[in-house]
Amino acid sequence: MIKNIWNMIEVYCGNNHKEDQKLEIQNGMYQIFYACPKYHIENRNPEERACNNRISMDDYEYMVSTISKLLEDAEMDNSPINLKNYKWTKKNIEYIITEHTNEKIKVYMRNKVAIKK
């Protein structure tokens, strides 16, 4: 596992907001999940529609694991890697890495099922 990988990754809503919306951890009725802050009325303009984009903890862990594996494989091969523009989809969730430095990996995610609601 890559050291501090959880702290390096920042996840943002990929639902085309004017400004970046970093996902926030939420306590759901049955489990913890990450959601777009634009879901809550206090974080949006009155005419703005609520954003339902969210990701479960299981899917979040999968995302971290995927990124970690890519970095580990490159490290094992002794080859430098930059994951900027790397895209993948799993369970109707699209991921794209838009920034990759030694300190930060910025990921935009879009849950196609949640956004339809």
Located regions from the model:
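Basic, low-complexity terminal or inter-domain segments flanking catalytic cores
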Residues: M1-K117
